[in-house]
């Protein structure tokens, strides 16, 4: 029993060390690539100084780290077991009667623990930094002028024109299919952010690049209220733009997502993107376990077939396949062709089935 515990602890340490090294290398590489891309995008922007772009790359780093985590587990596991196989440590262990499942268990447990920490502790931090990054990106690189927020009090939307005049729109209720706003209030501000007028109306709807505001009253400073039947205000917004302007799922903490999903659905907006992201986070610990099994199927075949080429090609192909399959099923989930939960869990399920079946073939076949 003591020997088994010592061996399991040794496997866990080897796995953790190789994973840590691979993870750090991948994060550094992606950080440098992101920084170079930000420099390219900000080259013509006066506000985009190298220091600010470096800060933006650092803010994006936690989100990037989450994205590369499954691939770091995959390649870290392959390298760990490749070293153990090359040093004949696994050969001796198997000769002593240790099954593949026994020496994989410590690595699987560590991967599951990493997944839990990543989702429950690291994700809230990454979502905060990603939210700051997206605000800076919108302001500095995209110079966005439209802002939208959804809360218990309704929909709040701000739009501005080229002259700097701003309109803040509040709606108590929304019909998202035609984007009809009910119980609408519009506040008008000039370029100096001074309040100029206000409109209270029953409804407002988007139609051919205009807000069509019906059955309302316009209040202008030092003037009597003026009722109206219809007013048109030019806008660059579209229903799709408004839906996409909601807080990105990447900026929402794992703990905040369920409440925001409920708020979206109560307001009449689709919540597929956020529901998919929530399920992907739920599946993350199990996906990391699956990556350990998939990596083991290639690294353990070395001792039987004697080549590192198969391990490298198999690992790269597995990573590419995971990325490709995930993109396809996520797109199907977002388009409601398949249930969102099924789309989110499919990459994990396929990886688990593949890894388990291949290991069964190696061990018992």
Regions inferred by a protein language model and the residue ranges of each:
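Internal alpha-helical transmembrane segments
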Residues: 58, 62-163, 347
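Interfacial "coupling" helices/loops that link adjacent transmembrane helices in transporter permeases
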Residues: 4-15, 86-104, 300, 304-310
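Short, aromatic-rich amphipathic segments at membrane interfaces
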Residues: 53, 57-59, 261-281
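Hydrophobic alpha-helical transmembrane segments in multi-pass membrane proteins
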Residues: 18-30, 63-75, 110-119, 284-292, ...
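Extended, hydrophilic extramembrane loops/domains of integral membrane proteins
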Residues: 239-268
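Transmembrane alpha-helical segments that form the functional core of multipass membrane systems
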Residues: 270-361
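Membrane-anchoring signal-anchor transmembrane alpha-helices and their immediate flanking context
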Residues: 1-87
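Non-transmembrane, extracytosolic/lumenal segments of membrane-associated proteins
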Residues: 50-51, 111-222
């Amino acid at each position: 029993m003591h020997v088994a515990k010592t061996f399991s602890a040794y496997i866990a340490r080897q796995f953790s060390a190789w994973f840590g090294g691979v993870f750090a290398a991948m994060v550094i590489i992606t950080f440098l690539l992101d920084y170079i891309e930000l420099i390219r995008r900000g080259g013509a922007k006066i506000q985009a100084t190298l220091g600010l772009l470096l800060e933006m790359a650092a803010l994006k780093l936690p989100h990037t780290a989450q994205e590369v985590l499954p691939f770091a587990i995959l390649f870290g596991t392959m390298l760990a077991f490749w070293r153990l196989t090359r040093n004949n440590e696994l050969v001796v262990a198997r000769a002593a009667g240790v099954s593949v499942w026994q020496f994989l268990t410590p690595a699987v447990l560590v991967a599951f623990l990493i997944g839990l920490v990543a989702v429950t502790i690291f994700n809230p931090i990454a979502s905060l930094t990603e939210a700051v990054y997206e605000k800076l990106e919108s302001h500095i690189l995209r110079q966005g002028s439209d802002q939208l927020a959804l809360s218990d009090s309704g929909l709040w939307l701000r739009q501005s024109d080229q002259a700097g005049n701003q309109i803040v729109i509040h709606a108590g209720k929304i019909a998202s299919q035609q984007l009809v706003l009910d119980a609408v209030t519009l506040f008008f501000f000039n370029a100096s952010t001074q309040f100029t007028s206000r409109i209270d109306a029953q409804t407002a709807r988007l139609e051919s690049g205009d807000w069509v505001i019906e059955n309302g009253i316009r209040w202008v400073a030092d003037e009597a209220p003026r009722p109206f039947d219809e007013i048109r205000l030019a806008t660059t917004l579209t229903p799709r733009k408004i839906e996409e302007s909601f807080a990105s799922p990447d900026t929402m903490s794992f703990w905040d997502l369920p409440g925001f999903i409920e708020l979206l659905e109560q307001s009449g907006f689709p919540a597929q993107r956020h529901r998919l992201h929530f399920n992907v986070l739920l599946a993350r610990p199990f996906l990391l376990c699956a990556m350990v099994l998939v990596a083991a199927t290639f690294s353990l075949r070395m001792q039987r077939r004697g080549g590192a080429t198969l391990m490298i090609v198999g690992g790269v192909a597995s990573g590419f396949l995971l990325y490709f399959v995930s993109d396809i099923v996520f797109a199907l989930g977002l388009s409601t062709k398949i249930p969102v939960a099924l789309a989110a869990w499919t990459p994990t399920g396929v990886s688990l089935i593949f890894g388990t079946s291949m290991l069964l073939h190696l061990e018992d076949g």
